[in-house]
Regions:
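Sec/Tat signal peptide C-region and signal peptidase I cleavage site
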Residues: 15-19
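Hydrophobic anchor at the start of a short beta-strand
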Residues: 51
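Exported/periplasmic ABC-transporter solute-binding proteins
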Residues: 20-47, 59, 63-69, 77-78, ...
Length: 249
């Protein structure tokens, strides 16, 4: 009887381990916003699908997807997304949602921005790419001032925000990260609602022809659900501290 029971446990455990598995390679901001914890349990196949979210900077997420370490890619850098699709690493792409970037800094130092420290993530993330695009349009290369007023953290949004608040400095952040951030100190939003600060998130289904090790059907099923009208409404309704976080067109 004991042998039969052990065989049954092993059989059941084996089936659980080999359930449909989908890995989402994601930017950190969507994970840190709490969106996945809110959204994914609504997926009709949630209980029978093991969904793993790997949250890293956009650059690393794209590299991971190129290496077939995920069936779905959710990032926010149009230039690198276009290159990913052009090189046939993705089969389809969908404009999932958008929010915006903001510039935060100390409340009492509004008139002295030029003499203060700016903290850059400098981590090849989508936020870092957006920041560098803004600097380029302004005609300034801030890296030539690295170590003086321009500080390159090489870290994620949370640690970079902590550095900014502790040093009384400034940084560019996505709005959702700021809403979730607890250590605001005396910092506030200084610049927002500008067209150049729009932050678009794309979702890409990784090309099965390149990554045949992945469970393509499971990834495709989740991808199709995430781009549905039902999910669009769920995304729009998601809030942090009574503030809308993401929008869908």
């Amino acid at each position: 009887m004991l042998k039969i029971l052990l065989s049954f446990i092993i059989f059941v455990g084996s089936n659980i381990i080999h359930a449909d598995t989908v890995t989402i390679q994601s930017t950190t901001s969507t994970r840190d916003s709490g969106l996945y914890k809110y959204l994914l349990p609504f997926y009709p196949k949630y209980k029978e699908t093991q969904i793993k979210v790997v949250a890293v900077g956009t650059g690393q997420a794209i590299t991971n997807a190129r290496n077939c370490d995920g069936g779905i890619l959710i990032v926010h850098d149009k230039k690198r997304e276009t290159e990913f699709m052009k090189n046939n690493y993705g089969s389809v792409i969908h404009n999932l949602m958008f929010n915006d970037y903001i510039i935060i800094g100390p409340k009492e130092d509004l008139a002295q921005v030029s003499g203060s420290r700016f903290i850059s993530r400098s981590d090849s993330s989508g936020t870092h790419a957006a920041e560098m695009s803004i600097w380029t349009k302004s005609g300034l290369d801030p890296t030539s001032f690295s170590g003086s007023w321009y500080l390159e953290s090489g870290q994620g949004m949370g640690p970079s925000l902590n550095i900014a608040t502790s040093l009384g400095g400034y940084t560019l952040t996505d709005r959702s990260s700021w809403l979730r951030f607890q250590n605001k100190a005396n910092h506030t939003i200084l610049y927002e609602n500008a067209q150049e600060l729009r932050n678009d998130y794309s979702m890409i289904l990784v090309n099965h022809a390149r990554c045949q090790n992945l469970n393509y059907e499971a990834a495709k099923s989740l991808y199709n659900w995430l781009k549905s009208a039902e999910v669009a409404q769920l995304i729009i309704r998601y809030e942090i501290n009574n503030n809308n976080v993401f929008y869908v067109e």
